[in-house]
Amino acid sequence: MAGQKIRIRLKSYDHEVIDQSAKKIVETVTNAGATVVGPVPLPTEKNVLVVIRSPHKYKDSREHFEMRTHKRLIDIVDPTPKAVDSLMHIDLPADVNIEIKL
């Protein structure tokens, strides 16, 4: 697979879980003999939801809820077949969204 690059994007609501997953991916691929660039922290996406507390009136009383989506980027430069195989068999938590592009 000379000249190719695998790009992995991780997304999660919990920053500790995403950092552990990124570390696990980097260790697994490095042990398989490929070179890794990252994990690169991407900007955190912040989604704010504003809800009126009262069901009828008192519009000035509002509650703010916030969802933060943490993102990381990992590039695998010149992946070996062993690295790709180990990447496919890695166990990661369910709350981490993974996108893999060749």
Swiss-Prot record:
InterPro entries: Ribosomal_uS10, Ribosomal_uS10_CS, Ribosomal_uS10_dom, Ribosomal_uS10_dom_sf. One of its GO terms (biological process) is translation. GO terms for cellular component: ribonucleoprotein complex; ribosome. SUPFAM superfamilies: Ribosomal protein S10 (SSF54999). Keywords: Ribonucleoprotein, Ribosomal protein. Pfam families: Ribosomal_S10. One of its GO terms (molecular function) is tRNA binding. Belongs to the universal ribosomal protein uS10 family. Part of the 30S ribosomal subunit. Involved in the binding of tRNA to the ribosomes. This is Small ribosomal subunit protein uS10. It comes from Bifidobacterium adolescentis (strain ATCC 15703 / DSM 20083 / NCTC 11814 / E194a). The gene is rpsJ.
